[in-house]
């Protein structure tokens, strides 16, 4: 399992940064498994709207990022937090033994913020980000996403720890609702882009 995970992580890094931009050990691991990524995802994103890009427009590339964000938010809200809370599957709790579930949920939403703002660790829109692009199309939709991201982070952080012992707390429902609100805001943003 560890080898498969290591290979998957190396392949993901190579798909984003390009095979020539990973360590020699990772490149060797990927090549030995014959699992070279077909496209350099990061380069494809940078080329949105240009000839040869997977995404024929900046809008299409932005929509792809928003869809990925929606997938993450839905997984956090309806599955990772929601399944235990609703009783659908109380064994679905992420990191139950380390008691890090809430940190994991929070970090998942931070990854959405990073994707939306266009950089790792970004707390505001970078020049070439979905947020900056959407602001030029529909500033209200952009502000709605930003506000919903921050509210979602706030509500997840407010859940009592550890999650494994508090998954029925009322603040858990607040976090689920905030995830749903963020998903709705992302859909408004997606619609604003495709209807522009």
Enumerate the predicted regions with their spans.
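Mature extracytoplasmic or organellar-lumen-exposed domains after removal of signal/transit peptides
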Residues: 1-196
